[in-house]
Amino acid sequence: MTRGDAVNLPEVLAEITALFHAYEAAFMRNDVEALNHWFWNNPALTRYGIADLQMGHAELVAFRAASKAPDFTRTLHNIRITTFGNHTAFAFTEFTRSDTALKGRQSQTWVRFADGWKIVAAHVSMVP
């Protein structure tokens, strides 16, 4: 159980915020190795994409290997990151892309393991 005063501990919030932005930079340059590294290497990993679904790290690795580098730019809006204690964080953002009028939404659930922070669940969607 997390004490109420353990929400958004400054050092944990700073750590996750930096990882969130590093993930975004890796996504935009299609750094597949970095992207795969940030996701939990476990069959319980879940990622819902815009038009795809990966259940488990092996499916995610296969998806990333087949994905092309983005041919658009992305601007993030309304980034909201909340941490609970030293081991759990949720990151949400809205985004716009240069190739569509649709509005994007993204969420990531991060957990700190012995080998560092990992995304254990993620969701990306686009809406009118």
Where are these regions (language model features)?
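Residue-level detector of high-confidence beta-strand sites
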Residues: 48-50, 122
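Short beta-strand segments enriched in hydrophobic/aromatic residues
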Residues: 39-40, 95-97, 123-126
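General beta-strand recognition
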Residues: 34, 46, 89-90, 118
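Structural motif
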Residues: 41, 84-85, 113
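Surface-exposed, charged secondary-structure patches
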Residues: 12-15, 50-51, 59-103
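Short beta-strand edge/turn micro-motifs at domain boundaries
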Residues: 90, 103-128
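Short, low-complexity N-terminal intrinsically disordered segments enriched in polar/charged residues
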Residues: 1-41, 53-54
